[in-house]
C-alpha cells in the first residue's frame, strides 16, 4: 500500500506533464491486464481498445464520439508508449517554461482531436486506404501539437543532446515532421502519420495566429487535474534531452 500511496502523492504534487505520464501509464497497465484475461478466455479483440480507440469510419464516430479524444491515451505496445512519454517529458516541460500548464493540456487534447479528424478524413478520401480498416491509438498527435507549438514560439531554442551538443529546436521538429511525411506512403501506419501531422498542424497554426496565446475552451476539463498555479521563473536557455 505504501507504493500506491507514494504514487498518489507523486501524482498530486506533479505538474501537468507528470500527470499525463501517470495517466497514460495507468491506462497502458490496465490494457495489459485486460489482454491477459482476454487471452485466457481466447478473446479476439480487447474490448477496452475497441471502445476507446478511434475507428476509421465516421459512422463509428457517431456512435462513439468520445473516441476522438480517448484514443490519445491508449498505446499499442511498450516501445510505442516509451517513445511517446519520453518525448512528452522533455518537450512538455520545455513547453510549460513559456506557456501555462492549462495550455499544455489544451494543446494535448486539441492536438489529439485534430489529429483524429485528419486521420478520419484521410482514411475516407485517399485510395491507399480502400479495402482496409484500422483503429487509431497513441498520444503522438497531442505530443506533436505541443512539440510544434513550442517550436513555432521559440524555433531557435537550443537543446543540449548528450554526445551531440547543442541543436536548435526547429531542427528536431523538422526531423519529427519529416519522418511523418515520409511515412504517409506506408501501408502499415499511414493513418497514424496523418494523425501526427494533424496535431502538428494545429500546434503550428494556433501559435502562429494567436495574439495572446490563450486557449480557454478546455478550462473545465483542465480543472479536473487540480493544477497548482504556475510559479513565475526565468526560462532556461538549455535543457538536457
Indicate residue ranges for each PLM-predicted region:
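Cytoplasmic-side transmembrane-helix entry/capping segments in multi-pass membrane proteins
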Residues: 103-110, 138-140, 163-171
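Small-residue-rich segments of transmembrane alpha-helices in multi-pass membrane proteins
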Residues: 112-114, 169-178
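Alpha-helical transmembrane bundle and helix-membrane interface signal
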Residues: 97-98, 153-166, 211-218
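N-terminal TM1-TM2 helical hairpin plus the immediately adjacent luminal interfacial "cap"
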Residues: 13-136, 182-195, 204
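C-terminal transmembrane module of polytopic alpha-helical membrane proteins
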Residues: 1-16, 25, 179-241
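C-terminal ends of transmembrane helices
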Residues: 4-8, 88-97, 154-160
